[in-house]
């Protein structure tokens, strides 16, 4: 049997880049909660003792940016300089301006255009992907790496492993076979976890706790065997972390946010962007399209691409490839997709309810993946039935 290895990684909510994603989306949530027509392009950067938010926001919402920054950092666990950042004492810098009037008139006519006439906020191309190898219809490498990271955070916050600190990274290598274009996981080849920790714990204790409380509950036993390799804090020491260890920036974990390297990526980040930004809304709708193709049984694996021009409502192109796993020709699946999904930005915002903020709606997406999540706020995960005409 011919097999191959594929690897995906993830990072925890305390990773400095992910901290920035969560701050940007927390600000988006706050704006949309008060003003669903908010136009938000919010970036965040961080380094030792500093968080800065900057970008373009046009909204009637009254938002205390500094308060949101501090509360987001605090919720993650950055409560002292020892762990990498002190939410209550760090410097918070804010440099927010209005959306460019040139962009505003071209995209939404300064809020005068009907939803179906709203243009894309920028050019770009986005990809959605789905595969039948997991119940989430997501790649197993990505699912396991992401769940390991989420479990690290869980056992830190519930004090199962009190020595844990917020920052951390995971990586999983899976051995696969290709069955006519479909991906069949055989076994987990390698598990890598690098997690920030306090001064009280030894490397041996870290390894024991990670295997017992993080790896065992997450990775099904059928995928582990005596040859599975474990690299647990292989650098030997990870006390300094968070923004103290590395600078962070919104939008630097776009593969972790999506499919762990499977499928393809158009390059646009998600966090801090309202739904007129097709980097986000376009990627969400093509995930729904690809997932619906696989869930409906039209293919075992599927990728969908959409592309846009700034100011133009209709997509320039829609593409589908089922990697030769389709039960009907790809051109017929493309027809079904175009009939079932409205790719115009204004209509995507309505159909996926993307103007609704609050309840950490978008902040939740900013750690542990935007896709494959079982949460009613992730409206793009709802399957649309696609039925070929008789």
Swiss-Prot record:
Tissue expr: Mostly expressed in flowers, seedpods and roots, and, to a lower extent, in stems and leaves.
Keywords per UniProt: ATP-binding, Cobalt, Cytoplasm, Magnesium, Metal-binding, Nucleotide-binding, One-carbon metabolism, Potassium, Transferase
InterPro entries: ADOMET_SYNTHASE_CS (IPR022631), S-AdoMet_synt_C (IPR022630), S-AdoMet_synt_central (IPR022629), S-AdoMet_synt_N (IPR022628), S-AdoMet_synthetase (IPR002133), S-AdoMet_synthetase_sfam (IPR022636)
Subcellular location field: Cytoplasm
Chief location bin: cytoplasm
The enzyme's E.C. designation: 2.5.1.6
Gene Ontology cellular-component terms listed: cytoplasm
Entry binding sites for K(+): 43
Catalysed reaction equations from the record: L-methionine + ATP + H2O = S-adenosyl-L-methionine + phosphate + diphosphate
Ligand binding (Mg(2+)): 9
Annotated positions binding ATP: 15, 167-169, 235-238, 246, 252-253, 269, 273, 277
Pathway annotation from the record: Amino-acid biosynthesis; S-adenosyl-L-methionine biosynthesis; S-adenosyl-L-methionine from L-methionine: step 1/1
Binding site for L-methionine: 56, 99, 246, 277
Alphabetized PROSITE patterns for the sequence: ADOMET_SYNTHASE_1 (PS00376), ADOMET_SYNTHASE_2 (PS00377)
GO terms, biological process: one-carbon metabolic process; S-adenosylmethionine biosynthetic process
Cystine connections: none
Family matches, as Pfam families: S-AdoMet_synt_C, S-AdoMet_synt_M, S-AdoMet_synt_N
GO molecular function, one term: ATP binding
Protein family according to the UniProt entry: Belongs to the AdoMet synthase family.
Function field: Catalyzes the formation of S-adenosylmethionine from methionine and ATP. The reaction comprises two steps that are both catalyzed by the same enzyme: formation of S-adenosylmethionine (AdoMet) and triphosphate, and subsequent hydrolysis of the triphosphate.
Subunit field text: Homotetramer.
HAMAP family, alphabetized: S_AdoMet_synth1
Protein name: S-adenosylmethionine synthase 4
Species of the source: Brassica juncea
